[in-house]
Amino acid sequence: MNPPAYPREEQRRNIQGTTVLIVSIDASGGVLDVEVERSSGNRNLDREAVKAARRWRFNPEVRDGKKIASRVRVPVEFKLN
């Protein structure tokens, strides 16, 4: 999974935060939907987290030997050093 881009204005203003996403995954590991479960408190950080998550691939859940669709909670941290 590639991390999201850090918005330049938020970097400049030293804004950090964590966006918690709920990602719906199909049986092949593709992303069906992304929702913000808990905002970072910054719209631009949340937007970049969702944008990145839509490009990710996951290992789907396996139940009774079959890959199935599922949902996962993913925290996305934006932190400056």
Please annotate each region the language model reported:
Residues M1-P3, L21, V31, V36-L45:
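Short glycine/proline-centered loop/turn elements that form peptide/ligand docking sites
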Residues M1-S24, R47-N81:
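Short proline/glycine- and basic residue-enriched helix-capping loop/turn segments at helix->loop/beta transitions
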Residues R12, A27-S28, N42-R43:
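Loop/turn elements at beta-strand to alpha-helix junctions within RNA-recognition modules
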